[in-house]
From Swiss-Prot:
Part of the 50S ribosomal subunit. Contacts protein L29, and trigger factor when it is bound to the ribosome. This is Large ribosomal subunit protein uL23. SUPFAM superfamilies: Ribosomal proteins S24e, L23 and L15e. It holds the Pfam family Ribosomal_L23. One of its GO terms (molecular function) is structural constituent of ribosome. Gene3D superfamilies: 3.30.70.330. Keywords: Ribonucleoprotein, Ribosomal protein, RNA-binding, rRNA-binding. Belongs to the universal ribosomal protein uL23 family. It comes from Prosthecochloris aestuarii (strain DSM 271 / SK 413). GO terms for cellular component: ribonucleoprotein complex; ribosome. It comes from the Bacteria. Signal peptide: none annotated. One of its GO terms (biological process) is translation. One of the early assembly proteins it binds 23S rRNA. One of the proteins that surrounds the polypeptide exit tunnel on the outside of the ribosome. Forms the main docking site for trigger factor binding to the ribosome.
Length: 109
């Protein structure tokens, strides 16, 4: 499989997990397994992954009422990965780089 990471999952709950426990949440491909996810995070962000937990999320069922009857459908199933890093490491979602506990210098002048 190429790259199982699709996007970071940024919600209020996932941001709290990042701040409190150092866990990061990503939306990943449904066919991805834990070892593929771990390798992709380590390669993309250059960090050491301590553990990976995954959750399969079922897509919502949708119904549309028309004159001819009811049209039923379903959104796609997807998977979330909870990634815990080793102590002192962090991921910066927005730049794609890592922060190894060093403070960034500001260039205000």
């Amino acid at each position: 499989m190429r790259n199982p990471l699709m996007q970071p999952w940024l919600t209020e709950k996932s941001t709290g997990l990042t701040e409190q426990k150092g866990q990061y949440v990503f939306k990943v491909k449904s066919a991805a397994n834990k070892t593929e996810i771990k390798a992709a995070v380590e390669a993309k962000f250059g960090v050491d992954v301590a553990s990976v937990r995954t959750v399969n999320c079922l897509g919502k069922t949708k119904r549309q009422f028309t004159r001819k009857g009811v049209l039923a459908g379903k959104k796609n199933d997807w998977k979330k990965a909870f990634i815990t890093l080793k102590e002192g490491q962090a991921i910066d979602y927005y730049s794609g780089s890592t922060d190894q506990g060093e403070e960034k210098k500001s260039n205000k002048g």
